[in-house]
C-alpha cells in the first residue's frame, strides 16, 4: 500500500500556488444592434475611442466614427454581408495603419495596402498610420525647386515646385488625368517617387492608366492606390490617406514624391454617404460640416521639408471635376482655397483642338517663378505677356474689320504662340526643348510659317538640336542659365533648320 507523504503534497501545492498567475484581461466588447448600407450600430463598446478599429465576430474590420450616448456608429471596411444582428464586436485598441516599404513601387494596391494586381504579397517590416499630422511651420521650407511636368503651358506659365499643392480642375473629358499621367511620365530619371490614387473611378479607366505607365517604364517608380466605383464608401474615403502615408514614408527618407488624387470630389461623396447614413446633420449640398477638414488635413500633408529633416518633398496634384464649368460649387471652392494655385482645363479649348486645354488666363500658381530655373524665367516672361496681349486683341478684333498692320502681325504671332503650346499626349518635353520652343516663337522665327506648319517645324527643330547641337542641352542642364553661347547655338540651329525645312516643303 502506497504511503502518502504530507511534505510532498504540501510542496506540490506550494509550487502550484507560486505558478498561479492571476491575469485579468479586460476586453472592450459590444453587440450588433443593426447593420446595413456599410454602417453598423453597436450597443456597448463603452471605452471605444473615435477612429478606433473594431473587429466583428466574422473578421470584418470597422472604424468607430460616431460615439453616441446609447450606441456607437461604425463604418465597415468591407461589404459586411456575414455580420449578424446580436453578434459580438470587440475594440482592438488600434487606429488605421498600413505597412510601408520600397517593395510597393511598381504595384497596384487597395486602400488597405493589399495588392490587387495578382503579383503576390508585398513584404514590409514597417508600418505607418493612415492619418498622421502634417509637418508644422518649423519643419518646412519655402518651395524653390521646380517639378517639371513636361508640358510647356504649365512649366512656362503656371510652374509647379516640389512641395507645392496645385489643383487640376475642369469638366469631365477635358484631359485632367492626361495632364497628371504626363507629369508622372516626365519624372523618369528625376528620382521622384510617384503615387497615383484613383478614388471611385471606373476599373477600366484605372487599368488604362496603369497600362500607359507600364508601356513607358514609369511603373518602376510609381505606386497606384485604387478603389473603384463599386468599392465600399469607407475604402473610397480612406484611399487618399493611404496614398499620402506611402508618399510620406519616402518624403521622410529624404526623397522627392509626387502624389495625384483622382479625384477628391469622389472622396467627399463617399464621406457624405457615410455621414448621412450615420445620421450626422447635413450642410451645404448635403455634405457634412467637416468636409473642408476632410480635404485640408489631406492636402496639408504635402510639404517641402526643412534641411534639418533632409529636404524631402511631397507635391500634391488633386484633380477636381466641375459640372459645366461651375467652379463656385462647394467642393471646388474648398479645394481651391486649400491649394497653392490651380490649372483650369476648358471644354471649349479642348473641343477647339487646343490640347492640353489649359486656360492660361485664369490658371495661376501661387509659388510662381520661384519654381523655375533661371533659363526658363529668361524666356517665359515674354511668352506670358504676348499671350495676354493676344487674348485681349483677339476679343477686340472680333468687332473690328480694318486692323492696322502692327495689330495683324501681333494677332498672327499670337496664333503661332498658341500653336506651340499644343502637345501630344504622353510626349513630355525636357526643359531645354521647352526653352528652345518658346524662344523660337517669341522671337518671331515662326512668323513666316503657315499655322499648319508650326508644329512640324518645331518637332524637326527639336530633333535637329538634339542630334546636331547637343551642347545646347548640356549648357542648360549644367548651368541652368540661357547663356549667350546657348543663344548663339540656338540661333544657328533655327536658321539651318529653317533652310532645310523650306527646301523640303
From Swiss-Prot:
Chief subcellular location equals: plastid
Q: Does the keyword Magnesium apply?
A: no
Going by the UniProt record, its keywords in alphabetical order are: ATP synthesis, ATP-binding, CF(1), Chloroplast, Hydrogen ion transport, Ion transport, Membrane, Nucleotide-binding, Plastid, Thylakoid, Translocase, Transport
**Gene3D superfamilies linked:** 2.40.30.20, ATP synthase alpha/beta chain, C-terminal domain, P-loop containing nucleotide triphosphate hydrolases
**Keyword Plastid tagged:** yes
Q: Which GO terms describe its molecular function?
A: ADP binding; ATP binding; proton-transporting ATP synthase activity, rotational mechanism
> Quick one: which residues bind ATP?
170-177
Catalysed reaction(s) here are:
ATP + H2O + 4 H(+)(in) = ADP + phosphate + 5 H(+)(out)
GO terms under cellular component? chloroplast thylakoid membrane; proton-transporting ATP synthase complex
Note the site residues: Required for activity.
363
Entry-linked SUPFAM superfamilies? C-terminal domain of alpha and beta subunits of F1 ATP synthase (SSF47917), N-terminal domain of alpha and beta subunits of F1 ATP synthase (SSF50615), P-loop containing nucleoside triphosphate hydrolases (SSF52540)
Q: What is its EC number?
A: 7.1.2.2
Q: What does this protein do?
A: Produces ATP from ADP in the presence of a proton gradient across the membrane. The alpha chain is a regulatory subunit.
Regarding protein family, the annotation reads: Belongs to the ATPase alpha/beta chains family.
Q: How does it assemble?
A: F-type ATPases have 2 components, CF(1) - the catalytic core - and CF(0) - the membrane proton channel. CF(1) has five subunits: alpha(3), beta(3), gamma(1), delta(1), epsilon(1). CF(0) has four main subunits: a, b, b' and c.
Name of this chain's protein: ATP synthase subunit alpha, chloroplastic
State the species of origin: Oenothera elata subsp. hookeri (Hooker's evening primrose)
Species classification: Eukaryota, Viridiplantae, Streptophyta, Embryophyta, Tracheophyta
Q: Gene encoding this polypeptide?
A: atpA
Amino acid at each position: 500500500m502506497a504511503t502518502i507523504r504530507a511534505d510532498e503534497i504540501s510542496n506540490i501545492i506550494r509550487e502550484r500556488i507560486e505558478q498561479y498567475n492571476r491575469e485579468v484581461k479586460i476586453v472592450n466588447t459590444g453587440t450588433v444592434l443593426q447593420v446595413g448600407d456599410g454602417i453598423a450600430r453597436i450597443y456597448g463598446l463603452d471605452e471605444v475611442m473615435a477612429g478606433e478599429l473594431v473587429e466583428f465576430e466574422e473578421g470584418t474590420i470597422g472604424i468607430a466614427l460616431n460615439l453616441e450616448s446609447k450606441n456607437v456608429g461604425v463604418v465597415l471596411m468591407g461589404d459586411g454581408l456575414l455580420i449578424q444582428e446580436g453578434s459580438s464586436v470587440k475594440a482592438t485598441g488600434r487606429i488605421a495603419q498600413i505597412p510601408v516599404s520600397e517593395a510597393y513601387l511598381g504595384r497596384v494596391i487597395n486602400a488597405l495596402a493589399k495588392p490587387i494586381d495578382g503579383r503576390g504579397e508585398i513584404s514590409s517590416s514597417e508600418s505607418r498610420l493612415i492619418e498622421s499630422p502634417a509637418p508644422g511651420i518649423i519643419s518646412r521650407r519655402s518651395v524653390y525647386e521646380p517639378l517639371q511636368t513636361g508640358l510647356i503651358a504649365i512649366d512656362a506659365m503656371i510652374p509647379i515646385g516640389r512641395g507645392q499643392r496645385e489643383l487640376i480642375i475642369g469638366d469631365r473629358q477635358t484631359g485632367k488625368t492626361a495632364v497628371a499621367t504626363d507629369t508622372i511620365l516626365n519624372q523618369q530619371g528625376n528620382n521622384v517617387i510617384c503615387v497615383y490614387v484613383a478614388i471611385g473611378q471606373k476599373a477600366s479607366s484605372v487599368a488604362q492608366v496603369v497600362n500607359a505607365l507600364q508601356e513607358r517604364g514609369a511603373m518602376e517608380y510609381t505606386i497606384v492606390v485604387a478603389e473603384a466605383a463599386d468599392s465600399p464608401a469607407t475604402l473610397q474615403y480612406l484611399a487618399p490617406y493611404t496614398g499620402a502615408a506611402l508618399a510620406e514614408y519616402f518624403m521622410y527618407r529624404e526623397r522627392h514624391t509626387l502624389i495625384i488624387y483622382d479625384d477628391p470630389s469622389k472622396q467627399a461623396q463617399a464621406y457624405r454617404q457615410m455621414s448621412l447614413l450615420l445620421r450626422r446633420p447635413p450642410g451645404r449640398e448635403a455634405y457634412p460640416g467637416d468636409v473642408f477638414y476632410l480635404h485640408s488635413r489631406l492636402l496639408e500633408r504635402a510639404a517641402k521639408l526643412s534641411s534639418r529633416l533632409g529636404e524631402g518633398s511631397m507635391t500634391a496634384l488633386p484633380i477636381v471635376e466641375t459640372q459645366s464649368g461651375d467652379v463656385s460649387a462647394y467642393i471646388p471652392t474648398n479645394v481651391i482655397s486649400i491649394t497653392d494655385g490651380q490649372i483650369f482645363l476648358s471644354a471649349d479649348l479642348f473641343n477647339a483642338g487646343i490640347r492640353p486645354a489649359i486656360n492660361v488666363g485664369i490658371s495661376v500658381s501661387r509659388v510662381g517663378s520661384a519654381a523655375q530655373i533661371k533659363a526658363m524665367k529668361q524666356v517665359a516672361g515674354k511668352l506670358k505677356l504676348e499671350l495676354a496681349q493676344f487674348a485681349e486683341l483677339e476679343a477686340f478684333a472680333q468687332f473690328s474689320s480694318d486692323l492696322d498692320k502692327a495689330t495683324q502681325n501681333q494677332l498672327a504671332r499670337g496664333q503661332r504662340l498658341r500653336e506651340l503650346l499644343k502637345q501630344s499626349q504622353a510626349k513630355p518635353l525636357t526643359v531645354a526643348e521647352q526653352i528652345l520652343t518658346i524662344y523660337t516663337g517669341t522671337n518671331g522665327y515662326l512668323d513666316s510659317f503657315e499655322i499648319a506648319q508650326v508644329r512640324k517645324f518645331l518637332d524637326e527643330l527639336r530633333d535637329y538640336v538634339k542630334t546636331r547641337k547637343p551642347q545646347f542641352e548640356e549648357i542648360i542642364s549644367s548651368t541652368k542659365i540661357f547663356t549667350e553661347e546657348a543663344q548663339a547655338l540656338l540661333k544657328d540651329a533655327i536658321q539651318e533648320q529653317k533652310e532645310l525645312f523650306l527646301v523640303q516643303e
